[in-house]
UniProtKB/Swiss-Prot annotation:
A cellular component annotation (GO) from this entry: cytoplasm
Residues that hold substrate according to the record: 3, 9, 41, 75
Molecular-function GO terms, alphabetical: L-malate dehydrogenase (NAD+) activity
PROSITE patterns: MDH
UniProt similarity note: Belongs to the LDH/MDH superfamily. MDH type 1 family.
SUPFAM superfamilies found in the cross-reference section: LDH C-terminal domain-like (SSF56327), NAD(P)-binding Rossmann-fold domains (SSF51735)
Function of the protein: Catalyzes the reversible oxidation of malate to oxaloacetate.
Name by which UniProt lists this protein: Malate dehydrogenase
Keywords for this protein: NAD, Oxidoreductase, Tricarboxylic acid cycle
Catalytic activity field: (S)-malate + NAD(+) = oxaloacetate + NADH + H(+)
InterPro entries with a match to the protein in the record: Lactate/malate_DH_C, Lactate/malate_DH_N, Lactate_DH/Glyco_Ohase_4_C, Malate_DH_AS, NAD(P)-bd_dom_sf
Length: 154
């Protein structure tokens, strides 16, 4: 289920949690050694659901289950580059935490060669944390942030 205007990532939980659970149950049976990258929102909780399903099936490996939040890094690099008049590929903002609102934490103090005022840190952090909502509202619910998905045969 994709986000629509007025929804946040947690609104997707009821539908997406069931989808992730069903898919991971099948993975546990058909390809128990698979590396699993989860991008389904809310990533913070869908990864935990996947882990529990894999544990229940007796095939959980903490080194093979990933929550994909690279989008937050790309957005952070882009916003910092915009603000500082640089190219996004020349910026590297470490981002820790989850992929849901205030759990997204850009480590702006760790960006090499760039300093920020307290106001810039506050404004950038808020923009990065709310970027997903900004995209959904700009698209008026008319699409998904996902370019494509694929299934690799086991």
């Amino acid at each position: 289920l994709r986000r629509k205007p007025g929804m946040d990532r947690s609104d997707l939980f009821n539908v997406n949690a069931g989808i992730v659970r069903n898919l991971v149950e099948q993975i546990a049976v058909t390809c128990p050694k698979a590396c699993i990258g989860i991008i389904t929102n809310p990533v913070n909780t869908t990864v935990a659901i996947a882990a529990e399903v894999l544990k229940k099936a007796g095939v959980y490996d903490k080194n093979k289950l990933f929550g994909v939040t690279t989008l937050d890094i790309i957005r952070s690099n882009t916003f910092v580059a915009e603000l500082k008049g640089k190219q996004p590929q020349d910026i590297n903002v470490p981002v820790i935490g989850g992929h849901s609102g205030v759990t997204i934490l850009p480590l702006l103090s760790q960006v090499p060669g760039i300093s920020f005022s307290e106001q810039e840190v506050a404004d950038l952090t808020k923009r990065i944390q709310n970027a997903g909502t900004e995209v959904v509202e700009a698209k008026a619910g008319g699409g998904s942030a996902t370019l494509s998905m694929g299934q690799v045969p086991g």
